[in-house]
Amino acid sequence: MSEGKLIKRSVFFISDGTAITAETLGHSLLAQFPNVDFDIHIMPYITTEEAAMNIVEEINQCQSRDGTLPLVFDTLVDPNVREIINTSKAVNLDVFEGLISKLEQVLGTPPTTLVGQTHAVTDSEYYKARIDAVHFALDNDDGALTRHYDKADIILIGVSRSGKTPTSIYLSLQFGIRVANYPLTEEDLDDNRLPKVLKEHKNKLFGLMIDAERLVAIRTERKANSRYASYSQCQMELRAVEGIFISEGIPYLNVSEMSIEEISTRILQMTGLKRRIG
């Protein structure tokens, strides 16, 4: 392999449910190997032997094309379906099998075999909390409805394109937390103080910081060669917003090198917010 060239490898996330569990765990593990270019295939709701055989054919085609064994992460409950998947020309990484058998030994009770149970709507209160939180995050994105801030669990603030929206959505979807977010504009920063609507909810504020170089790269994707994406503008905004965070005593986090999952976990740790689900 020539220097700087990425290794290519096909990856399959297979589930009899949404595949969210297999995908989440798989991505967390694959992130440890940045020198590999992963070709991701997501296969949810594989509940029949026929569907499994079709997947095996696709996996084998990838193996033949790539010349390497694909990686297969699965959360399949049905042993017959799983057995078919295991006949593929791949490295099969059953997410549940080893863990379930260990838990069965420790707990002294057999597991259920309900297909797709991981993300099923088995608890209506949890489901409602998740949906309500996601609706809240969408309705209160980017300073849209500040009159609802009294109902927020947390209000994320920071400059434009600092990661507020994806973090809000993840916190709401994964933990059922009601998150609003508000962009601190150049006008806000010129005044060097919090907008009145934020001061009224200061105890709910949490700041997101980002390195200037990273912010330039993100903004350039949106508005290349603009003042908005220039290094001087980004640096000015970030210095001003960090000054506000410090002077107002607002907790904040530099998210430049963090994934959304890491950002969300750190926010929970730093604020002591209690998750409603998960």
UniProtKB/Swiss-Prot annotation:
Protein name from the UniProt record: Putative phosphoenolpyruvate synthase regulatory protein
Family the UniProt entry places it in: Belongs to the pyruvate, phosphate/water dikinase regulatory protein family. PSRP subfamily.
UniProt-listed Enzyme Commission number(s): 2.7.11.33, 2.7.4.28
Protein's organism: Acinetobacter baylyi (strain ATCC 33305 / BD413 / ADP1)
Signal peptide boundaries: none
Residues annotated as binding ADP: 158-165
Keywords attached to this entry: Kinase, Nucleotide-binding, Serine/threonine-protein kinase, Transferase
InterPro entries: Kinase-pyrophosphorylase (IPR005177), PSRP (IPR026530)
Record's catalysed reaction(s): [pyruvate, water dikinase] + ADP = [pyruvate, water dikinase]-phosphate + AMP + H(+); [pyruvate, water dikinase]-phosphate + phosphate + H(+) = [pyruvate, water dikinase] + diphosphate
MF-aspect GO terms: ADP binding; ATP binding; phosphotransferase activity, phosphate group as acceptor; protein serine/threonine kinase activity
Organism superkingdom: Bacteria
Functional note: Bifunctional serine/threonine kinase and phosphorylase involved in the regulation of the phosphoenolpyruvate synthase (PEPS) by catalyzing its phosphorylation/dephosphorylation.
